[in-house]
Amino acid sequence: MLSIDIRSDHGDLSLQVKTRIPNAITALFGPSGCGKTTLLRAIAGLTPSRGLLTFNDEVWQDESVTVPSHRRRIGFVFQDDRLFPHLTVEQNLRYGLERAQANGVEVKLTLPDVAEHFDLQTLLRRRPTTLSGGESRRVNIARAVLGQPQLLLLDEPLTGLDSQRKAEILPYLAKITRELQIPTLYVSHINDEIAQFCDNMIVMQQGELVDQGSTAEVLPRLWRESLGADRNLTEAGSLINAWVARFDPDYSMIHLQVGNQPLQVIGPTMPETSQIRLFLAAKDVAIALQPPTDLSIRNTLVATIRSITPMQDEAPGLVAVELVIDQPTEPQALSAHITAAACDALSLEAGAQVFALIKSARISSPSLFES
């Protein structure tokens, strides 16, 4: 657990953050200049700050103590590349590993394994100046991981990587951070990255924390509260956790369970019991008062209406219906955008049980969420 209660002034920015970061992957989100990088640098001990900073039972900073950056065992991936130009890729990677070994840290991640997962085997003898931007990013992340960190700070680490590389690296990062229980702060402006990779979210504005919670709670709120600088990055919708019941190869159909309710999506073969996350766009959720029959829409979830809000400013004539999926385990929120006319015609109101018709769903890689 990382506990933060710090203040720091830098030019026009006054940073003031008080929060606790769990041992999970937490997204740090906000507009440019809001203090995300400054906060990471303060946590790492690279930027002066005042206040209290503790990690687990160790005090990193208070009125009388400031633990130097190199003794905090933090893996930091900066926005710009920080590779040593006079060393080869392999020597850069060994630098992080050897520092950990010199400090008596147990080595759980080896260079061959990390190089394989980041596809660096063919780059090991090259110098950083000969690498592309995407290759440099991969080496930077790998070196941070090989340092056997007890905390990872990733400042837009996948910048410059194409979607295929991101799809390869994100599952591995998620796997090692969860298996080794490395708390991670992850700065990104990309909605899909946050949805797939992060368990929790922190939203910052003008140096302050303005929202915090699970990704499934916070990410859908960003659109409604207009906190995103670009609404294309925060499409209205919901993140739903599900698990794979079986795969039907005849139809390329994944049969899922959302709590005790079935749901089907087209997708690749996935191992049974894999935990996955779905994105359901609010515009793709319809509402019925009775179980529908003879429809091409195959997915229906029983849910209870929590609230109905007119969208007069964003989309006149529409209402945002917030629902809770009926299930015996932890409730999951679901958003639907329907016309005000349909809402009135169905006499919808808070507390009513309805049937949510899911027109489409976007699925994330199951390997990100396997326990």
Describe the predicted segments one by one.
Residues 262-310, 331, 337-371:
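Glycine/charge-rich catalytic "coupling/switch" loops of P-loop NTPases
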Residues 60-75, 99:
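ABC ATPase NBD coupling module
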Residues 152-156:
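Catalytic Walker B motif of ABC-type/P-loop ATPase nucleotide-binding domains
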